[in-house]
Structure formats: structure tokens, C-alpha cells
Amino acid sequence: MSEIYRFGVSLDKSLIEAFDRHIQSRHYHNRSEALRDLIREELVRKKWTEGGTVAGAVIMTYDHHKRELVNRLLDIQHDFQKTIIASSHVHLDHDHCLEVIAVKGNAADVEQLSLKLKSLVGVKHLSLSISSAE
């Protein structure tokens, strides 16, 4: 584990009160935990916008009865085989499936995969969750 550094932060009263409410609503034990998470989120966002390496999950639901949808989903996934590291498929009911695709790679590639899958007719919902790969 790395060394822990302490530093002071000056905030106006209304901002610290809002931050404390945020901490309480998220069940953090202290301000340091919440601040660490906010910094990490911002660093991941920076990697995303600058095209760094990210890891995450594409989560989508779709109607597998839509004509040619499954074939198109598979074609796109094969086009991104360097980005996709695993996938899991779940049958929600007779008509609908849930697919979770684990990804790792350049942020732009991950975004392109997500956008291509989301644009297909029959994909009901798609969300992308990213984190730092480092």
C-alpha cells in the first residue's frame, strides 16, 4: 500500500455542509474516503476524455427475437475482440436477454463499442460503466 499524505482543504461553509450531506447519503465513514472517491472519479473521467486505458462493463438488455440482432451483436463483438475480455449472457424471459461485457482498452475503442451496440434496433437499454485500468 502507498504512503498516506495529509493536507488541508479550505471550503466555504455552504460547500462543506453540502459535502457532509453527500457523505452521509453515501454512507462514507469520513470526509477522506469521500474525497478519495471524488478524486478517483475525476481521474477516470480525465482518462476517458484523453483516450487513456480504461476497464469497465457494457450492460445491455435486448429482444433476441429481433431479426438479425443476435448476429449483428456477435459481429460487433468480434470486431472488438481486443477490447472485450469476457462476456456473460442471461435469459431474462422468453423474449429478453441481459448481456454483460467486460472491457479493457483505449477509452475511444470502448466508447465506439458501446455506441455501435446501443444503436442496434432491438437493444432495449445499454449502460457503460468505466473505471481506471491502472
Curated annotation (Swiss-Prot):
InterPro entries in UniProt: Acetolactate_synth/TF_NikR_C, ACT-like_dom_sf, Arc_rbn_hlx_hlx, CopG, CopG/NikR_regulator, Ni_resp_reg_NikR, Ribbon_hlx_hlx, TF_NikR_Ni-bd_C
Keyword match Transcription: yes
Keywords attached to this entry: DNA-binding, Metal-binding, Nickel, Transcription, Transcription regulation
GO MF entry, a single one: nickel cation binding
Signal sequence segment: none
Disulfide bonds: none
Amino acids binding Ni(2+): H78, H89, H91, C97
Co-factor binding details: Binds 1 nickel ion per subunit.
Cofactor: Ni(2+)
SUPFAM superfamilies listed in its UniProt record: ACT-like, Ribbon-helix-helix
Record keyword Lipoprotein present: no
GO term, biological process aspect, one: response to nickel cation
Protein family membership: Belongs to the transcriptional regulatory CopG/NikR family.
Function: Transcriptional regulator.
Name listed for the protein in its UniProt record: Putative nickel-responsive regulator
